[in-house]
Amino acid sequence: MDAVSLREKIDGDWFFRGGAWWRLEPIAGIRNMARQMLEGEARFATIVATSAADRSLRVSWHWDVFGTLLSVESLLPPGGLMPTITDIYPGADWAERETRDYFAVEFAGRDSTPPLMLRATDRPGILLETKGAVR
């Protein structure tokens, strides 16, 4: 399926920004969004998280559809659980583990989230600590 058809199938408000198509989605809708992306044969690219002043995280999931980037953005409140998509997209494992390492995110639906970039004895959330905003 091409990117235009997939956006139309998923429906909702998509907007073009920075060379990609974006959609805002509540955090509870991410697993459904991932399923729809998989049905549309979108390739999972990555997860990006950035911290906000109120200690929430802006999280975006990115998929590639034959060279067109479809990105879905959600807000994760402080201490909130992020739903895993690794059972839908196994390739999301490393991105979820990296997000855990850097932002101390806990994933609902994962048996474990072992460190990827940190040692097992390191405390997750190193990017939050460098900004002085430990979760």
PLM feature spans:
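Terminal low-complexity/charged segments
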Residues: 1-135
